[in-house]
A protein has these predicted regions:
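Glycine-rich acyl-CoA binding loop
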Residues: 91-106
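Non-catalytic substrate-recognition and accessory regions of acyl/acetyltransferase enzymes
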Residues: 1-92, 108-113, 120-131, 135-170
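Generic non-transmembrane alpha-helix signal with a bias for helix starts/N-cap capping motifs
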Residues: 99, 117-119
Length: 170
């Protein structure tokens, strides 16, 4: 991200959904990996990570609204329960990390816990301070439709929380 100036924006449900639909179109093999936000819940806050190249002005062709610039990733948080969901990055190289920015923003809005499969996401979330508080064996009955068993195996399902949060105590 060193070539970019980035910022976190609060966005509307419609803007978040548009980004999510774009992600699902570009990444059909991951289309069922990102949670849809609950419908009609006033406790949901949507965020987007957007950026621009440092050496140029905010490009006018993307419009005055920052969400119209380079969309790098998004997430949502339920401010009443602390649940963080729908974290994704756009079609960026694997080495471009957006999760730290998104998780810092969701934590600032009251996010304290999330779910994932054991593996790279667990490692990413652990670097942001989340610890595993519950672990369940992989269950094919609940596996995403697009799950690739040959590549992804059958990792445990995890609930991770920030230490000291209500979810961490269980």
């Amino acid at each position: 991200m060193s070539d970019f100036d980035v910022t976190i924006c609060i966005v509307t449900q419609g803007q978040y959904t548009a980004m999510l639909n774009e992600f699902r179109t570009i990444n059909p093999n991951l289309r069922d990996r990102v949670d849809d936000p609950p419908v009609d819940d006033d406790n949901i806050k949507y965020i987007a990570l957007v950026g621009k190249f440092k050496w140029g002005p905010w490009p006018p062709l993307f419009g005055p609204n920052p969400v119209e610039n380079f969309r790098l990733g998004a997430a949502w948080v339920n401010t009443s329960t602390g649940y963080i969901g729908g974290v994704f990055k756009t079609n960026l190289p694997a080495n471009v990390q957006v999760a730290p920015f998104l998780l810092d923003a969701t934590k600032a809005l009251g996010g304290t816990w999330l779910e994932c499969f054991d593996g790279k996401l667990r490692e990413t979330y652990a670097k942001q301070g989340f610890v595993t508080v519950a672990r369940s064996p992989f269950n094919r009955e609940y596996a995403p439709e697009t799950w690739n068993y040959d590549v992804e195996g059958e990792p445990d399902y995890l609930v991770m929380a920030l230490p000291g949060s209500p979810t961490h105590k269980y």
